[in-house]
Amino acid sequence: MKQRITVAGDSDNYQLLKAYDVNISGLVSTPMQNEARRLRPERWKVANQEGMAEVARFIEMNGSFADENRDW
């Protein structure tokens, strides 16, 4: 869902882009998407750190379920 936001920028650059009918929202949206894509995995890791540690402890104590199927 798109939401209206306010962005501060250089007035001269804004006027030039506006004069050439450049889609300023598109210019801003792409870097925001890229940054959000970079931050989501970091947030997930922090939120799930305790669960991942518990899985690691379980595997350390009991081994992996796939260990018996390994051919190497």
UniProtKB/Swiss-Prot annotation:
Family matches, as InterPro entries: Post-segregation_anti-tox_CcdA
Coiled-coil region: none
Record's function text: Antitoxin component of a type II toxin-antitoxin (TA) system which inhibits the post-segregational killing (PSK) of plasmid-free cells, also referred to as a plasmid addiction system. Binds to and blocks the activity of CcdB; will also remove bound CcdB protein from the CcdB-GyrA complex by forming a CcdA-CcdB complex, a process termed rejuvenation. Functions as a transcriptional corepressor for the ccdAB operon, repression also requires CcdB.
Entries under Pfam families matching the protein: CcdA (PF07362)
Organism (species): Escherichia coli
Family classification: Belongs to the CcdA antitoxin family.
Protein name: Antitoxin CcdA
GO molecular function: DNA binding
Subunit structure: Homodimer in solution and when bound to DNA. Forms a complex with toxin CcdB; the CcdA-CcdB(2) trimer is sufficient for rejuvenation, whereas maximal operon repression occurs with CcdA(2)CcdB(2).
Keywords: DNA-binding, Plasmid, Repressor, Toxin-antitoxin system, Transcription, Transcription regulation
Signal peptide as annotated in the record: none
NCBIfam families listed in its UniProt record: PRK13710.1
